[in-house]
Amino acid sequence: MEKNDVINFKALEKELQAALAADEKYKRENAAKLRAVEQRVPSYEEFRGIVLASHLKPLEQKDKMGGKRFVPWNCHTTRERTSQDVVTEIPQEKSPFQPTTSAEFYRDWRRHLRSGPERYQALLQLGGPKLGHLFQMDVGFGLLGELLVALAEHARLSDRTAVLGILHSLANTGRFNLNLSLLSHAERESCQRLFQKLQAMSTTRPMQEGLTVEEPSAGLQGEEGLLQELLELYGVH
């Protein structure tokens, strides 16, 4: 086996542990969200606080007693790494964004897709039908706002049909109205800005296709009907 072909099992184990932790975080936050809804919390701030604190556990009796704790010093943990400890790492290419569950989407969206353009292209790559299938039960806490921000910042005229399809699929996901009501002020502004962009494209696109605004094609008429429906679903006026 060539030196560059040595597999870094420690890195693979670390990646697996991170994936399991992300899945657990997704389930924990959704459970906290349901509890907050059942408790009828009076404000978004309190709702958000409950979800963000979902990882905290009540203190056990032994933790409340106080007192100093002494940890034995382990000389073996401070030794220098030898040549046997060093494993040649294989350069890992960025894998395509192909989540098969909402938990995988949530994990990879937060871990690998950091920039706005990357997130926008990932949404276009998946498309409305795939997103609708992934989130048929519910969009994770805070995720709807992030999706709308990515679309608002990078939507282009050539992608208008695809963006409308994505918005339509998201509007048909579980608990959509609840997630919509929990958008932050900045996310609501992004949503408003996105629909303003889409409306502005209504006059730009016919001109590029050699049509008049008064006589759009049948396809454009269908898109305009969908846009009006989405304006109502997203509460944009």
Swiss-Prot record:
It comes from the Eukaryota. It is found in: Cytoplasm; Cell projection, Cilium, Flagellum. The keyword Lipid metabolism does not apply. Its main location: cytoplasm. One of its GO terms (cellular component) is outer dynein arm. Disulfide bonds: none annotated. Residues 8-33 form a coiled coil. One of its GO terms (molecular function) is protein homodimerization activity. Keywords: Cell projection, Cilium, Cilium biogenesis/degradation, Coiled coil, Cytoplasm, Flagellum. GO terms for biological process: cilium movement; determination of digestive tract left/right asymmetry; heart looping; inner dynein arm assembly; outer dynein arm assembly. Pfam families: Dynein_attach_N (PF15867), RPAP3_C (PF13877). Dynein-attachment factor required for cilia motility. Belongs to the DNAAF19/PR46b family. Homodimer. This is Dynein axonemal assembly factor 19. It comes from Mus musculus (Mouse). The gene is Dnaaf19.
